[in-house]
Regions:
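Soluble non-transmembrane domains of integral membrane proteins
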Residues: 1-221
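Helix-loop-helix
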Residues: 78, 90-111, 151, 179, ...
């Protein structure tokens, strides 16, 4: 689950303007909108929502949200109309505020996946910062472009600031034990009697490798395939190809499973034949056990002779399973 606000389970994304003339310095700015209700109509691909506030009657700030159909990426643009006789200066900020509560989807069948903040720098393309790391110390770094987000098993929320500016990224905890991953942009300056704007983006949705790669460099690294990445990556590619034809993710997963089953049909057949053979000779094996009792050497030799006579490999049911196991671990 993404973005909620309840007792002990705050997961909130916020953005605004701080600094010299920032309107969010002493608290959240109050905006007004033209309409009370906005809806993306049928046939409409883009929805624009403008929130407007005035500062001392000579500066107007419009916070423009742009939503696109079938997209989890939101454009947020700050448009400043400076009708004063002085330069207007501020910094754009974006933050994710989250309490330390577990994500049920972060516990998979083969271990706990990463739950925490993620970011990138020029020197390190993918940095993971969990709650314990923030408890130890706050961290801050500057980089050109970049992004900062919060990662859980299947989903990601991330702020992507202006990619041409130098931005500062910080992870910290406040006195109320709330955890923050945030950025502050470089100077946003609007000259006297002029208009200026700055755009940022916010993504909140599933971890789609190809979508994330197009949004910002290294954002696709938030998909942690683990030590079986060499299997997971092609499986995901195949899944996206099937989904592009079918158009239904649930059906695509079923078809992918059938494809994998078909690829391993011969191995599965060998496994089932071996298991059937073992069941068939069970009475004879019991007779051997009764005959040799505590004579382990005799029991072992007679058992191996039986396997050879019946042409059965006792490991025939296990080896195909071991070969298939890594692949099905990646399908979980």
């Amino acid at each position: 689950r993404l973005l909620e606000s309840s007792l002990g389970r705050n997961y909130v994304a916020q953005s605004g303007l701080i600094g010299k003339n920032g309107i969010d310095n002493s608290g959240r700015a109050t905006y007004e909108s033209i309409y009370n209700n906005y809806q993306l109509e049928d046939g409409q691909e883009l929805l624009q929502v403008d929130l407007i506030t005035s500062v001392q009657n000579d500066v107007t700030v419009t916070k423009r949200f742009t939503f696109r159909r079938n997209s989890y990426l939101i454009d947020i643009e700050f448009l400043v109309e400076n009708n004063s006789d002085t330069t207007w200066d501020a910094n754009v900020f974006g933050q994710i505020k989250r309490d330390n509560f577990d994500d049920p989807s972060s516990v998979g069948g083969f271990g706990r996946t990463f739950l925490g903040f993620v970011t990138t720098t020029v020197d390190d393309p993918y940095i993971k910062v969990d709650f314990d790391d923030i408890d130890d110390r706050s961290e801050s770094a500057e980089t050109t472009g970049g992004w900062i987000g919060f990662s859980q098993h299947y989903f990601l929320s991330a702020w992507i600031p202006n990619q041409e500016q130098t931005n500062r990224f910080t992870t910290r905890r406040n006195d109320a034990n709330q955890y923050f991953g945030e950025f502050t942009s470089g100077a946003f300056t609007v000259s006297a009697n002029s208009v200026g704007s700055q755009k940022i983006q916010f993504y909140s949705g599933p971890k789609d490798q190809y979508v994330l790669a197009e949004i910002s460099p290294n954002l696709d690294l938030t998909i942690d395939y683990g030590f079986l990445w060499f299997l997971a990556a092609p499986i995901y590619w195949l899944l996206t190809q099937i989904d592009s034809l079918v158009g239904n993710y649930g059906v695509s997963i079923i078809l992918l499973t059938l494809v994998v089953k078909a690829l391993f049909y011969k191995l599965s057949e060998t496994q089932y034949k071996s298991m059937a053979g073992m069941r068939r000779i069970m009475p004879k094996m019991q007779q051997i056990k009764d005959r040799y009792g505590d004579d382990r050497m005799g029991l072992q030799k007679a058992t191996m002779d039986l396997y050879k006579k019946e042409k059965i490999n006792p490991f025939g049911g296990c080896l195909p399973m071991l070969v298939q196991m890594p692949l099905f671990m990646r399908l979980e």
